[in-house]
Amino acid sequence: MPPRRSIVEVKVLDVQKRRVPNKHYVYIIRVTWSSGSTEAIYRRYSKFFDLQMQMLDKFPMEGGQKDPKQRIIPFLPGKILFRRSHIRDVAVKRLIPIDEYCKALIQLPPYISQCDEVLQFFETRPEDLNPPKEEHIGKKKSGGDQTSVDPMVLEQYVVVANYQKQESSEISLSVGQVVDIIEKNESGWWFVSTAEEQGWVPATCLEGQDGVQDEFSLQPEEEEKYTVIYPYTARDQDEMNLERGAVVEVIQKNLEGWWKIRYQGKEGWAPASYLKKNSGEPLPPKPGPGSPSHPGALDLDGVSRQQNAVGREKELLSSQRDGRFEGRPVPDGDAKQRSPKMRQRPPPRRDMTIPRGLNLPKPPIPPQVEEEYYTIAEFQTTIPDGISFQAGLKVEVIEKNLSGWWYIQIEDKEGWAPATFIDKYKKTSNASRPNFLAPLPHEVTQLRLGEAAALENNTGSEATGPSRPLPDAPHGVMDSGLPWSKDWKGSKDVLRKASSDMSASAGYEEISDPDMEEKPSLPPRKESIIKSEGELLERERERQRTEQLRGPTPKPPGVILPMMPAKHIPPARDSRRPEPKPDKSRLFQLKNDMGLECGHKVLAKEVKKPNLRPISKSKTDLPEEKPDATPQNPFLKSRPQVRPKPAPSPKTEPPQGEDQVDICNLRSKLRPAKSQDKSLLDGEGPQAVGGQDVAFSRSFLPGEGPGRAQDRTGKQDGLSPKEISCRAPPRPAKTTDPVSKSVPVPLQEAPQQRPVVPPRRPPPPKKTSSSSRPLPEVRGPQCEGHESRAAPTPGRALLVPPKAKPFLSNSLGGQDDTRGKGSLGPWGTGKIGENREKAAAASVPNADGLKDSLYVAVADFEGDKDTSSFQEGTVFEVREKNSSGWWFCQVLSGAPSWEGWIPSNYLRKKP
């Protein structure tokens, strides 16, 4: 037996138009064999697709399924459908890539290039020698042949029944989905393309948008004789039992795989793939790589890899398809040409209960999420048609190949890239969806005008931070837990304003963990959130209006202006929106709340959302400053860290306003402050007793009101309350006072003394931070050396409340300090109001995301004229989180229903 000939050369010459059974294009290929002969063959793109699928199934290692770097099988040019492009344009654009594919294929090692599948694909078939004649098989039942009109544009069909793919070359369908038809085959299997993939699907699950049914009724004289090649047992009353070898008359054909036949005087339906024309070959269920280029009834002997027997033996009984078909036994005929798994299988029957052409299902409502793809690590390609990229770039996925490689486009470049370097973010869609739309290139340049810093920061982080190689390692993502839709858009303005206004109060603390910086950030996230500069300006104006109008709304009792000096520095960064850097130790998956959702864990930096208002992390881990009420991140444990009780809130709260002064921490600080206070306060006994809240309230001396205690303390030390807090820092300072962090109890004692409205008095934390960072544009001088008086920053929590009203006194105290430690006069009160207003203005109303935030009181709180009292265990719904440390809440249980401002350090996230 002479040795089998091998392929020497393959050249794709051109494309040719065919009209039978419907309009399509085939590639003209010249094949030179080792025997010296040169032959011309014609193949459709779908045949190449089938060959590729067969190759990848047969040679998984060489196809890069296990290790993309070991792939040697060339990539089949992706689906270049260009939406509704003319078919010829698509075919021509694929011409050179298909030629390169063929050349690369035959240059592979012999065990691949000379394997049966490849040789069969390039062998000449009867249809190559005698191309189909231009004749109509019959006339369509309705609508006429819409595809006969030039220019040829891909037809679109609507999915009327769900279908779950059963082979790698197939794709799954969902009712209402719209697909582009690339090839209609009489086997009943059509080659289609969706937004992201292409493959074979049963035609019975589709219906033309124009009502055309692709059915041909044959006139009596046109009826053709066919021979049954596989036995078939009817599964429905209108089907026919077939015996191998029987000759039947086909009276009605269609492209859905089921033909009406007449046998022994009876009429019924039979699978077209079980029949063969008396003079022809069996019709394959789906054109395969080895099948002839001509699709349709003449597409007779291709072996489609789609016909894998395993798992195909059983046909999925689809309710929509009436479950009329089941697995057929593997045909024993045609065995020599087909591998055991390559067998024919009819598509499911069409569900006749669904009226044809009427009320086609509407496309599914776009999922609640829109998908965007980004590169998660740097990649340098080693293949000619690959693409190299950096981490954090937005990607347009043109084709998802089962091999693990995706054909992508980044800006104006495209090529193959390993799917493991690309991840998907799902953007929660809502009324503000536009906020998530990525700006167009020209919009990006505009955006840069107002946020050059932000962009710089984003890209910088991407370049600077060592990008994480693969998505394996989860990265913590810092985000505001609430939907960013509202603030994101304006986050830039907010940040800008924040830095300019109260640098610290509105600013977001930027997490500046060096560790976090290492994580790659995804700049695109920011762009995708901010739609346009105009929008930003509009936001800015809106915010300004809000600030002005905000006065009337209940103000946080004693807004603590950004006491933390250092925090303020971040504001500048805030304006750039430095990417929030989560602690390395914090790894968690993005959540939908954030508007993101990804399969692998990503670093906050990677996500780089504008949302994350950079929260600069104070050395002491001050509570995150709350961005304009940016939704807190539920996942993000507020860095406020372990404040006694506040800690929980930090968890959800997004960065708290610097004003907040770590209210959460406050609590802890207060407590610790107690002990430290003693030392700091020169041993004021009562204050020591005051304990927990001492830091802020400096426990009141026995005979004094809370306000007084502070005054006295301040006076004794010769420091203004603020200064005291500065000194107190040790206690409040998270770092200084670990104990405070750990001790959540303070609140309980505090309640007795009136926890000193921590938010106002909490300056201490700031103090601590102040030492580490410059006070954010603090109105008053920072405490210098702890001894210098801290200029009363309006928001500093240290104000000594007028004896009776701790909150007011606090704020007053802070301001009084400015004037003089002891001035707690009514004047202070007025100032407090100002502070509140400022803080309120600084805080961004964040009602949207807070509605579902439930918090529980961790201690009893005694209110004053501006605030209400509540008991430990009371459940609140947080409506707004103010950077001052005061949150506007509504009581849900444990007390009569009321709304008002309460200190956040008395709350913790409800489990």
Swiss-Prot record:
Listed InterPro entries: NADPH_Oxidase/PX-Domain, PX_dom, PX_dom_sf, SH3-like_dom_sf, SH3_domain, SH3PXD2_PX, SH3PXD2B_SH3_1, SH3PXD2B_SH3_2
Start and end residues of each SH3 domain: 152-211, 221-280, 368-427, 850-911
Domain comment, as recorded: The PX domain is required for podosome localization because of its ability to bind phosphatidylinositol 3-phosphate (PtdIns(3)P) and phosphatidylinositol 3,4-bisphosphate (PtdIns(3,4)P2) and, to a lesser extent, phosphatidylinositol 4-phosphate (PtdIns(4)P), phosphatidylinositol 5-phosphate (PtdIns(5)P), and phosphatidylinositol 3,5-bisphosphate (PtdIns(3,5)P2). Binds to the third intramolecular SH3 domain.
UniProt modified residues of type Phosphoserine: S279, S291, S499, S528, S843
Clinical condition linked: Frank-Ter Haar syndrome: A syndrome characterized by brachycephaly, wide fontanels, prominent forehead, hypertelorism, prominent eyes, macrocornea with or without glaucoma, full cheeks, small chin, bowing of the long bones and flexion deformity of the fingers.
Name assigned to this protein: SH3 and PX domain-containing protein 2B
Composition bias type Gly residues, residue spans: 822-831
Organism: Homo sapiens (Human)
Compositional bias segments (type: Pro residues): 282-292, 643-653, 756-766
Biological role stated in the UniProt entry: Adapter protein involved in invadopodia and podosome formation and extracellular matrix degradation. Binds matrix metalloproteinases (ADAMs), NADPH oxidases (NOXs) and phosphoinositides. Acts as an organizer protein that allows NOX1- or NOX3-dependent reactive oxygen species (ROS) generation and ROS localization. Plays a role in mitotic clonal expansion during the immediate early stage of adipocyte differentiation.
Species classification: Eukaryota, Metazoa, Chordata, Craniata, Vertebrata
